[in-house]
UniProtKB/Swiss-Prot annotation:
Keywords: 4Fe-4S, Cytoplasm, Iron, Iron-sulfur, Metal-binding, S-adenosyl-L-methionine, Transferase. Catalyzes the methylthiolation of an aspartic acid residue of ribosomal protein uS12. Belongs to the methylthiotransferase family. RimO subfamily. The gene is rimO. Signal peptide: none annotated. InterPro entries: Elp3/MiaA/NifB-like_rSAM, Methylthiotransferase, Methylthiotransferase_N, Methylthiotransferase_N_sf, NA-bd_OB-fold, Ribosomal_uS12_MeSTrfase_RimO, rSAM, rSAM_horseshoe. Residues 158-397 form the Radical SAM core domain. This is Ribosomal protein uS12 methylthiotransferase RimO. [4Fe-4S] cluster 1 binds at residues 40, 76, 105. It comes from Ruegeria pomeroyi (strain ATCC 700808 / DSM 15171 / DSS-3) (Silicibacter pomeroyi). It catalyses: L-aspartate(89)-[ribosomal protein uS12]-hydrogen + (sulfur carrier)-SH + AH2 + 2 S-adenosyl-L-methionine = 3-methylsulfanyl-L-aspartate(89)-[ribosomal protein uS12]-hydrogen + (sulfur carrier)-H + 5'-deoxyadenosine + L-methionine + A + S-adenosyl-L-homocysteine + 2 H(+). It is found in: Cytoplasm.
């Protein structure tokens, strides 16, 4: 067996690795800004938009604290552990640079931030781009040079050049008791279909090979707009996830859907995934969270686990190669051993391909904090261990069945030892990889190549070029 990678699925998709930006060299005297981006891909898109605006105004982007005239920290406030990470990042930026502007979800609690870090220059809430720019202008006045300061046509990206997150809406209409996202980011606000498609086309024209569609609730896209129509390429396109996915699937790039709730109309997407002429990947990221109806009711989630299994069966009948990813919470207040066992039994039936799980923790402001019968920490850990053991066994069996298959992969990274790739079943950061460790020297990030799978592990595959 080749050496196993240390790459199980990311168990905390709400806390993606921090992204720091490095870009082209700045000109002499150019004001420069550093960026630390924490949290989910939706926050990463906010960071990209802020940096794109700053580049358009003549600011340079520094990859380190020392070269920056000021630093923006885009925070996460979804969980208490995320708040602690954000406070640590702010403290590090203050220590290393001294001029710090805070934005993002934790920015919705300015008094809390200033209590811990009174030296910060300014605090703004999530997706408040204009306020961030105003704060930057006050700390570091712009000094643009129109003959030198060039902005990439696709804007500034914090991801590798070959894939990009595409945010189609803000906010959420759900009232899940464990979540404070609607309080921080507001109700659902969908972008017009033509604006999404124009951005997607520009990204693909500039070399992006994979579009990762994100929002708080992707399947609710357009609900707030009453599914209005927009003119795109001399035809009308409805602001509905099915219509949007169909149009995106005509672009020359992989299209991957994240944060899809299992509404009945999701079944309309599955034939598009099965259509060889559409680039919508057979992949659904659906946050089921639990399977026992009583637990789901306490979460204020749709309590229809039995129908969920029926939907999964229907999806697989239409598109047998579909990959299903989900995240779950164990140890939610009031969760009994019987309820947890129902979740394990549901997992046996659902046979999900990619699974992440985290133990429940209180979040300041969440209604779940006041629920009775909180689960002891040692019980939460024990249940998490049992859940992940089952998920790992399912993953290992499913990947073993892929040995001998010939599949397409996209190259993410190439070093001296191997090319790190992903299959159509794997999203960046949160899923597994396929490694090519022979004959890979000519590959470049963004290449899409054909491989034969010749070995499988618990979460990763290995293959050789065909």
């Amino acid at each position: 067996m080749r050496a196993m990678s240390t790459n199980p699925p990311n168990l905390r998709p709400d806390l993606a690795p921090a992204a720091r930006l490095g870009t082209a060299a700045t000109r002499p005297g150019q004001p420069t800004i550093g960026m630390v981006s924490l949290g989910c891909p939706k926050a990463l898109v906010d960071s990209e938009r802020i940096l794109t605006r700053l580049r358009a105004e003549g600011y340079g982007i520094s990859p380190d604290y020392a070269g920056a005239d000021a630093v923006i920290v885009n925070t996460c406030g979804f969980l208490d552990s995320a708040k602690a990470e954000s406070l640590d990042a702010i403290g590090e930026a203050l220590k290393e640079n001294g001029k710090v502007i805070v934005t993002g979800c934790l920015g919705a609690e300015p008094d809390y931030i200033r209590e811990h870090h009174p030296r910060i220059l300014a605090v703004t809430g999530p997706h408040q781009y204009e306020q961030v720019l105003d704060a930057v202008h006050g700390a570091v006045p712009p000094d643009p040079d129109p003959f030198v300061d060039l902005l990439p046509a696709s804007g500034v990206q914090l991801t590798p050049r070959h894939y990009s997150y595409l945010k189609i809406s803000e906010g959420c209409n759900h009232k899940c008791k464990f979540c404070i996202i609607p309080d921080m980011r507001g109700k659902l606000a969908s972008r017009p279909a033509h604006a999404v498609l124009r951005e997607a086309e520009k990204l693909v024209d500039n070399g992006v090979k994979e579009l990762l569609i994100i929002s708080q609730d992707t399947s609710a896209y357009g609900l707030d707009r009453k599914y209005d129509t927009n003119l795109w390429k001399n035809r009308e396109v409805r602001s509905h996830i099915t219509d949007l996915a169909r149009e995106l699937g005509q672009l020359d790039a992989w299209v991957r859907l994240h944060y899809v709730y299992p509404y009945p109309h999701v079944r309309e997407l599955i034939p598009l995934m099965a259509d060889a002429g559409c680039n919508l990947l057979p992949y659904l990221d659906i946050p089921f969270q639990h399977a026992h109806p009583d637990t789901l009711k306490r979460m204020a989630r749709p309590a229809a686990a039995a129908r969920t299994l029926d939907e999964i069966a229907a999806w697989r009948e239409i598109c047998p190669e579909i990959t299903l990813r989900s995240t779950f919470i164990v140890g939610y207040p009031g969760e009994t051993e019987a309820e947890f066992q129902t979740l394990l039994d549901w997992m046996d039936e659902a046979q999900l391909d990619r699974v992440g799980c985290f133990q429940y923790e209180n979040v300041a402001g969440a209604r779940s904090n006041d629920l009775p019968d909180h689960v002891p920490a040692e019980v939460k850990q024990e249940r998490w261990d049992r859940f992940m053991a089952k998920a790992q066994a399912i993953s290992e069996a499913k990947l073993a069945a892929r040995v001998g298959q010939v599949i397409e992969v996209i190259v993410d990274e190439v070093d001296d030892e191997a090319a790190t790739c992903r299959t159509k079943s794997d999203a960046p950061e949160i899923d597994g990889n396929l490694f090519i460790d022979e004959g890979f020297e000519g590959l470049q990030p963004g290449d899409i190549v054909t491989v034969e799978v010749d070995e499988a592990g618990e979460y990763d595959l290995w293959g050789r070029l065909r």
